[in-house]
Structure formats: C-alpha cells, structure tokens
C-alpha cells in the first residue's frame, strides 16, 4: 500500500511543483470555433508521462442522457491545416511507431468527458510515448468517443480541434 500512495504523492508533486515539458494549445476548426484548450505533458520518470487536458467550448447536446464524450489522440504530423470539407487531415493518422492495431497505438489516449457547460478536464498517466517523442506531433480532438475497436482509428468521427505539440519555453 505504501508504494501506491507514494507514487500518487509523486504525481501530485510533479503537477504542483514542475513545469510541463511540452504543450498543445488546441483550437477548433471553422465548424467548432468555440473549442479552445491546453494539453500539458509532464515527464513522470520511469512511470511515463502525465497528460493534463483542460478544454473549453466543446459542443454539448444538453440532453438528459447525453454522450458528450470526445476522443483525443496524438497524431503523427504536426500540421493542423483545416479546410471546410476535411478539417485537420494534414495531421495524418494516430502516432503509431510500432505499427500496432488500434487501440494499441502510442497516440491513443482516454476520451474527454464534457460537462454541461462544454468544459472538460482530465489527468492521465501513460507510458505509450515519451515527452520528447511527441514534440512536433499533433493533438486532435474528435467529435465522437473512440470505440477502441474499429480499425484504423476507432470510428471517432470528425476532427474538431487540433494543435501542434511544442516544447514549453522553460525547456527550449
């Protein structure tokens, strides 16, 4: 039990006392202009990377039993060019250096669950990539949740927001 508690304390210490190594400042496509957010990446030593996501303006349905869940992935290219028909296709596919089937891509992350007001916040620990590996890649938010089965990308739907992952000022 002590080890588990100690690791959690270490993660809280990292988030409260360290600066992120990398960041992505997501912006919505022309069809989702209200979506803005910040995804921060903190090295967590031998445990991997802590990913902190804080996103606002997500499109929510307002229904009682809503499913306002949005897939989030690291994509292979850092380009976030958008056109009216296919937003952010320039970002390429999911980061997948080992050529694994979905959902075992390095870039597969848990989804964001939006609140009634369109805001979402999450903290995730992953060992699928290192912070240095994702510099110059992109973060994509999708309109639907990932089903974690459909190949090649989980049937997550339209790409609604994107950002290139950059090294933070502190680490340049």
What is each stretch, according to the model?
Residues 1-172:
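N-terminal leader/targeting pre-sequences
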């Amino acid at each position: 039990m002590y080890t588990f508690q100690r690791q959690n304390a270490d993660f809280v210490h990292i988030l409260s006392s360290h600066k992120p190594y990398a960041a992505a400042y997501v912006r919505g496509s022309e069809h989702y202009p209200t979506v803005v957010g910040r995804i921060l990446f903190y090295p967590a030593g031998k445990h991997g990377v802590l990913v902190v996501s804080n996103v606002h303006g997500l499109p929510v349905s307002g229904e009682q039993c809503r499913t306002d869940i949005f897939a989030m992935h690291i994509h292979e290219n850092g380009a976030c060019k958008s056109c009216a028909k296919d937003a952010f296709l320039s970002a390429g596919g999911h980061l997948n250096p080992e050529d694994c089937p979905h959902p075992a891509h390095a870039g597969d992350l848990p989804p964001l669950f939006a609140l009634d007001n369109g805001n979402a916040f999450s903290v995730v620990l992953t060992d699928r990539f290192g912070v240095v590996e994702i510099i110059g890649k992109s973060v994509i938010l999708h309109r639907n949740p990932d089903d974690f089965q459909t190949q090649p990308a989980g049937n997550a739907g339209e790409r609604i927001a994107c950002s290139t992952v950059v090294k933070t000022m502190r680490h340049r």
